[in-house]
From Swiss-Prot:
Alphabetized GO MF terms: G protein-coupled receptor activity
Ranges per topology, Extracellular: 1-21, 87-102, 168-189, 256-275
Record's protein name: G-protein coupled receptor 146
Chain's gene name: gpr146
Compartment list: Cell membrane
Membrane topology, as annotated: Multi-pass membrane protein
Keywords: Cell membrane, G-protein coupled receptor, Glycoprotein, Membrane, Receptor, Transducer, Transmembrane, Transmembrane helix
Residues passing through the membrane, by range: 22-42, 66-86, 103-123, 147-167, 190-210, 235-255, 276-296
Glycan attachment points: N8
Similarity remark: Belongs to the G-protein coupled receptor 1 family.
Organism, scientific name: Xenopus laevis
InterPro entries (UniProt xref): GPCR_Rhodpsn, GPCR_Rhodpsn_7TM, GPER1-like, GPR146
PANTHER family tied to this protein: G-PROTEIN COUPLED RECEPTOR 146-RELATED, G-PROTEIN COUPLED RECEPTOR 182 AND ESTROGEN RECEPTOR 1
Keyword Signal appears in the UniProt entry: no
Function description: G-protein coupled receptor required for the regulation of plasma cholesterol levels.
Amino acid sequence: MWSCEDLNYTNSGEEQYLCNEFHLFLFIFSVLYLIICFPVGLCYNVQLVLVNLYNKATMTMPDVYFVNMAIAGLIINAVAPVYLFGPAYTKWSLWSFGNEVYITLLILFNVSSLVIMYSTTLLSLDYYIECALPRTYMSSVYNTKHVCGFIWGGAVLTSFSSLLFYICNHVSTKIIECSKMQNREAADAIMVLIGYVVPIIAVIYALVLILQIRKEATPLDQESGRLDPSVHRLLIATVCTQFILWTPYYVTLLVNTFMDARVKSSNTFYIRIFQFTEGLSNFLAFSSSFVLPLIHRHINKNFSGKLQRLLKRLHCGSQGCTHEHTVVQQVMT
């Protein structure tokens, strides 16, 4: 976040007034996020992870992808308050952390954003495979460890080159090798490519193939044992939500890469417009951490039953409920 004290307004009082309005608008959104979105996202993401881990026997591949997205959402949920109320915004000495802490938070945010995008992409591609060959892949979780390792490991590896530019941009005075890698715009361009362009191309390709298959009237499409239709609604809602919330963030990165409005523009009005847009896009990106579990909770019809089993287990303890013992005794009798 930013404050209106960063730049001097010498032209008129309108720019100062507009800056204060932008600042107040983002401040209200930040407070609302901290009061509403943060606890809701924390609760529902933890709930999504625990419910699926407890019901491992009934997990499907969509559940695996949503668990990974929920874990990434928890990380983003933890980073968001530090960003929204950080030292650049509040000027509090309590938040005066160094470059190392900033880089750590940036790494966590970038990796988590890639995990969310890659999980959404793989969900789309796997759903296409399931539509083409029903009951062959998504109903099984035999390769869960490999999928999770691929998602998180791939996110770390693909973001490594971008992270080098970010690190060298902040600690170049300490590392001689970083003297030629002080280009934040290059890091932003890499993140746009690997975190948005590649996933959206893959998702669009998968959705086109899925649409073609659903238009064809084949016996496989009429099969009663095919994948739950609610998975299709969940897929469409997830893809649309993720790209709606993350597109502004990557667009601002792209604009900053090719224009660098904060440096090249001498007009403080346009600088503040860009900073306001950038702050709003970051807020939308943070919002994905609580919107996604809400969508999953309301569309996935099997989640409520899994949650009830988990709550019953927690309520009864490891020895089981009284009515369960009664049923067992009746069967034995």
